[in-house]
């Protein structure tokens, strides 16, 4: 580097020399002798600024002095002046080079000084990656670690005497984060299963709601038929305890006053303490009560009276006794026949929906299944029992061999001649403890003994065929 500087300055001298001022020649003494210049011993060099100022002043002084003819001694003094100037330049360059080396050494020592590593919280634990080659100007934390023992694996105990460049702060949260990830994954699976289960439950709920809505849809003729049945109780616009007890006694039911009150409380749907026609209609169109009554009649005739189905039992006896007008009988039997068929189809649909849930292996609530399907699930078994009873060889009914279940009674106008109103037969009948076997002939005032009744006459929903016109 010094050689380059010297070459550069020699080239500058070549360009500067033609413009250098002429130096005065040696002075001659008065005695005719030649005066010789004396050079003082070189002392300490002044600073560069002082030298520059002195060099600027020297040419001025040289220009002010009178020029004299140059001689050989002047040429020698010019060479000495050039050599002194080059020495000054070289010394200045050496000082600047040493200056740069010293500052560079200080910067390197400052970079090599140890720094304390502070753990910084990160969003996810990651192992520190050491690059293969890092320049010297990079930060201290990115450089290669000093040669020594290999760093311990993540989470392992590190001795205090050994320097370790690995940050252990994020590694402490690794266990918690694993538990959090497991918890999130379990929540996702549960939410996915729940999301798949909700459409099935909603479909079941909609099916059940549609069934409940269809119960309220009655035609005008059907409503008038149920009103005719309601007027039999002869109450003051409602069914009270006295009227209900009188009808039960006429039908041969032996009930207590507590059972009558329970039946009225069950029929009071709106809870106002009165059983008006609206409550009566809601009870008679209730699908659950209807199927419960059908099941009780199919199982046993000696079953205890159910207060929730007592009105159905009274209606069953009135239909079998032909104690209602012909149009009323036809509308009521057609209504319950349709309800029985719809209940059977809906029970099959409900079973299919539950089967799909089981095939998909999704958890479902069995209690909810029982509460929503108990009446409908037993329809098929009830029908099979009714068929077995109808086809039994010991039955004497002429309708025992009918291959299908029809719910409308056979009304032959030529054989059965009823009076315009047969309520008088109920008014004349007052025996409270009549046997079921003699109950039917007691109400044969208009049929002249042409109809036969047996002990199974209460099963009118399954034993009587439909009317043909």
Curated annotation (Swiss-Prot):
Comp. bias intervals (Low complexity): 62-73
Which CDD domains does the protein's record reference? EFh
Q: Which InterPro entries match?
A: EF-hand-dom_pair (IPR011992), EF_Hand_1_Ca_BS (IPR018247), EF_hand_dom (IPR002048), SPT21 (IPR043520)
Q: Kindly state which keywords UniProt assigns to this record, in alphabetical order.
A: Calcium, Coiled coil, Metal-binding
Q: Which residues form the EF-hand domain?
A: 255-290
Write out the biased-composition intervals (Basic and acidic residues).
49-61, 450-459
Function, please? Answer: Involved in the differentiation of haploid spermatids.
What protein name is recorded for this chain?
Spermatogenesis-associated protein 21
- Give the species this sequence originates from: Homo sapiens (Human)
Q: What is the lineage of its organism?
A: Eukaryota, Metazoa, Chordata, Craniata, Vertebrata
